[in-house]
């Protein structure tokens, strides 16, 4: 049995008097024999509490102070193994078996979080590290196993060893004594190469190599930027819109940004003549997210040929609708979100999965076509819980209800951003007859004339089997 951490070795004579942490004052004051401190069996290898000597002593009871007999062997055997060890530290069986040193236990001598480790490196520890460094001047990067080995030898932690080697390499670089080729940082040297002044004090040829590699990296990054700037395909979040109709490639981001700033200045004058240019990324002024912004622009089939005034209530950017002629490279967001089910929807109908934040824009939709292409939300079952779909109690597949019953009705009275779409079967029609919605806007129809003012709070129905009550 090894000594506990921080246990100082004392002479066997003083052990019996002072360093018995397992006993109270009454046990120490009990009479004991002189042979007890010298017994050969009261060591870490003393019998366990199941032995005959222990049970004989336990029969007397442990409520009173321990009773010691004149027999040294029986008295030493009467203690458990964790109590008998402090009395005899130097038995013949233990010499050399367990060596005690003040920096760790014998079972696991290398402990990272051991508080007994020294906090600063001594001269002999650094001498060991310097010897290893002199032997490996061509490659002064110790591996993980070598660091652990050096940490065990020098009684240092792994972080101390890694920091010492990092400082040693930095010191050699400053003295222009680099005899190794600089290499990239690996997972072993995450803490070693942390400083930003890596090639600052190197020799001129090493500094030249560093500038060449940085120039190559910069060229690669510029090439990647040019590829991303000149691609007309949509980004992963679907924010990029189609570019000019005649150009096969998009403009760079800075040019589009400058032109977009000009568009904001004189949008009222040049709105009908600038529809060939669309902003690179819509700046949303409504509570719509960036994912819904490209969906607000009508698909190419539903886009009117003539100029149409952009409504002030639902616009997300001052840009005009997409060009009339479809360019070669079309936006992938439009292609991915378009669907063949779109002509079956009536005027002003949106997908059922429309969030509550998009309700102000959906109420002012153009009557000529669907403002939202039929998204993949229609193709999967939608389950509505009570905060979002209050009075719809079927909790079934809305797509089957749309196609089989020919029914889709919204109550847009919940147009506030904090509310959701509630669809009461009778309350929707009653609210539609009550009055016009305040967010309603006029739109120019594709034919050129205005349709009569349609109540925005009136539910929109799919053209099909007629209006039928909910299931």
UniProtKB/Swiss-Prot annotation:
UniProt entry tagged with the keyword NAD: no
Swiss-Prot/TrEMBL GO biological process terms: cell development; negative regulation of transcription by RNA polymerase II; neuron differentiation; proximal/distal pattern formation involved in metanephric nephron development; regulation of transcription by RNA polymerase II; specification of loop of Henle identity
GO molecular function, one term: DNA-binding transcription factor activity, RNA polymerase II-specific
Alphabetized UniProt keyword annotations: DNA-binding, Homeobox, Nucleus, Phosphoprotein
Matching InterPro entries: HD, Homeobox_CS, Homeodomain-like_sf, Iroquois_homeo, KN_HD
Biased amino acid composition, Acidic residues: 261-273
GO CC, one annotated term: nucleus
Taxonomy, superkingdom: Eukaryota
Localization of this protein: Nucleus
Protein's name in the database: Iroquois-class homeodomain protein IRX-2
Organism of derivation: Homo sapiens (Human)
Taxonomic lineage of the native organism: Eukaryota, Metazoa, Chordata, Craniata, Vertebrata
């Amino acid at each position: 049995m090894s000594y506990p951490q921080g246990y100082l070795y004392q002479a066997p004579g003083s052990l019996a008097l002072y360093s018995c942490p397992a006993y109270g004052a009454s046990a120490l004051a009990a009479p004991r024999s002189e042979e007890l401190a010298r017994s050969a069996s009261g060591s870490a290898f003393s019998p366990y509490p199941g032995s005959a000597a222990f049970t004989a002593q336990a029969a007397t009871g442990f409520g009173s102070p321990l009773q010691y007999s004149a027999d040294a062997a029986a008295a030493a055997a009467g203690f458990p193994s964790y109590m008998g060890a402090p009395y005899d530290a130097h038995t013949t069986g233990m010499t050399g078996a367990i060596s005690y040193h003040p920096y760790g236990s014998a079972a696991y001598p290398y402990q990272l979080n051991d508080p007994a480790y020294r906090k600063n490196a001594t001269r002999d520890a650094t001498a060991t590290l310097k010897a290893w460094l002199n032997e490996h001047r061509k490659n002064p990067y110790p591996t993980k196993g070598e660091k652990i080995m050096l940490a065990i030898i020098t009684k240092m932690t792994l972080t101390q060893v890694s920091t010492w080697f990092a400082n040693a390499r930095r010191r050699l670089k400053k003295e222009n004594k680099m005899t190794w080729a600089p290499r990239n940082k690996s997972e072993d040297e995450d803490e070693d190469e942390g400083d930003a002044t890596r090639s600052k004090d190197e020799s001129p040829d090493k500094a030249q190599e560093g500038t060449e590699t940085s120039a190559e990296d910069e060229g690669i990054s510029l090439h990647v930027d040019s590829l991303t700037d000149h691609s007309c395909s949509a980004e992963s979040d679907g924010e990029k819109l189609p570019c000019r109709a005649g150009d096969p490639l998009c403009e760079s981001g800075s040019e589009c940004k400058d032109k977009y700033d000009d568009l904001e200045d004189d949008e009222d004058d040049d709105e009908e003549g600038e529809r060939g240019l669309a902003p690179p990324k819509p700046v949303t002024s409504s509570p719509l997210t960036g994912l819904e912004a490209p969906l607000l622009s009508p698909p190419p089939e539903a886009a009117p040929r003539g100029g149409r005034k952009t409504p002030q209530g639902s616009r997300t950017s001052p840009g005009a609708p997409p060009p009339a002629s479809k360019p070669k490279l079309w936006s992938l967001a439009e292609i991915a979100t378009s669907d063949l089910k779109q002509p079956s929807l009536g005027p002003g109908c949106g997908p059922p999965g429309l969030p509550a934040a998009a309700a102000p824009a959906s109420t002012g939709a153009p009557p000529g076509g669907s403002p939202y292409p039929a998204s993949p939300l229609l193709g999967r079952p939608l389950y509505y819980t009570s905060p979002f779909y209050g009075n719809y109690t079927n909790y079934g597949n809305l797509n089957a209800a749309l196609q089989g019953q020919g029914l889709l009705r919204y109550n847009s009275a919940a147009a506030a951003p904090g509310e959701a779409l509630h669809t009461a079967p009778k309350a929707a029609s009653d609210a539609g007859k009550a009055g016009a919605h305040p967010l309603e806007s006029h739109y120019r129809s594709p034919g050129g004339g205005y349709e009569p003012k349609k109540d925005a709070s009136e539910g929109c129905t799919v053209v099909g089997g007629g209006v039928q009550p909910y299931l």
